[in-house]
UniProtKB/Swiss-Prot annotation:
GO terms for molecular function: ribose-5-phosphate isomerase activity. HAMAP family: Rib_5P_isom_A. This is Ribose-5-phosphate isomerase A. SUPFAM superfamilies: D-ribose-5-phosphate isomerase (RpiA), lid domain, NagB/RpiA/CoA transferase-like.
Length: 232
C-alpha cells in the first residue's frame, strides 16, 4: 500500500463519522483532499452537508467537486472538523501548517464540537518536532519577531534554523496576507510551554502547535486504519 492509498484509507474511516446534515470544517493538505473527494461522492448521491473550508485551495476543490460551502461567519458553530496533520503524538498534540493554512485551520477547529485528524502512519511520532514548526507572522517587524522567537527558543533549551518560507516568486504569503517562519527545533519536549511563549509574541499571528484540540486521530498503515484517542 503506497502513501496515497493510506491517506485514502484514513479519509474513508473519517467519513464514517460524518452524519447527514452536519456543519463540517474541511481541512487543507493532501490527506484532507482525499477526504473531500470521498465526501463529494456522498454528496452527489444525496448526502447533505454544509462545509467550511480552511483555505482557498480547499474551497476551490470543494467547488470543483460540488461540495456545498458556507463561510464561518454564516456557520459560526460547527459539528465536526476533519483535517490532516504533519505530526501527531500519543496525546494527539499536533504540528500543522505545512500547507500554509494553520491560522484558518485553528480557527475552524476551535469553532467545532470535535476535530478528527487523519494521517498516514509516517506522521505518528513519540515527541513532536522532527517536522519543522510553522509560525505565521505579520510581515511588519519581521526581523524583530524572528529575534523574539529565537529568545523564546533559547529560554526553553531549543535551537535550530528559522527559515522564512519561500514560494516560486518570493516569500510565501498565506491566505491572510502573512508570512511563515519554519522553525526546525528538533525534539520539542514541552509543546505546551512553547505554545504559550509563542502566543506572547505580538508579531506571531499563530503557530502550528495544536494542543488539546483533536478528539480522535485516524492513522492509516499497510494493515488498514486505526483510531487513536488522546492519551492525556
Amino acid at each position: 500500500m503506497d502513501a496515497r492509498e493510506m491517506k485514502i484509507k484514513a479519509a474513508a474511516a473519517a467519513l464514517a463519522h460524518v452524519e447527514d446534515g452536519m456543519r463540517l470544517g474541511i481541512g487543507t493538505g493532501s490527506t484532507a483532499e482525499e477526504f473531500v473527494r470521498l465526501l463529494a461522492e456522498k454528496v452527489a448521491s444525496g448526502f447533505k452537508v454544509e462545509g467550511v473550508p480552511t483555505s482557498e485551495r480547499t474551497a476551490r476543490l470543494c467547488v470543483e467537486l460540488g461540495v456545498p460551502l458556507k463561510s464561518l461567519d454564516e456557520l459560526p458553530a460547527l459539528d465536526l472538523t476533519i483535517d490532516g496533520a504533519d505530526e501527531v503524538d500519543p496525546a494527539l498534540r499536533l504540528i500543522k501548517g505545512g500547507g500554509g493554512a494553520l491560522l484558518r485551520e485553528k480557527i475552524v477547529a476551535a469553532a467545532s464540537e470535535r476535530m478528527i485528524v487523519i494521517a498516514d502512519e509516517s506522521k505518528l511520532v513519540d515527541t513532536l518536532g522532527a517536522y519543522a514548526l510553522p509560525i505565521e507572522v505579520n510581515p511588519f517587524g519581521l526581523v524583530s519577531t524572528r529575534i523574539a522567537i529565537e529568545k523564546v527558543a533559547a529560554r526553553l533549551g531549543l535551537a535550530g534554523e528559522l527559515s522564512l518560507r519561500q514560494s516560486g516568486d518570493g516569500e510565501f504569503t498565506t491566505d491572510g496576507g502573512h508570512h511563515i517562519i519554519d522553525a526546525s527545533f528538533g525534539r520539542i519536549p514541552d509543546a505546551e510551554a512553547l505554545s504559550s511563549e509563542l502566543n506572547s509574541i505580538p508579531g506571531v499571528v499563530e503557530h502550528g502547535l495544536f494542543i488539546n484540540m483533536a478528539a480522535l486521530a485516524i492513522i492509516a498503515g499497510p494493515a488498514g486504519a486505526r483510531t487513536l484517542q488522546a492519551n492525556r
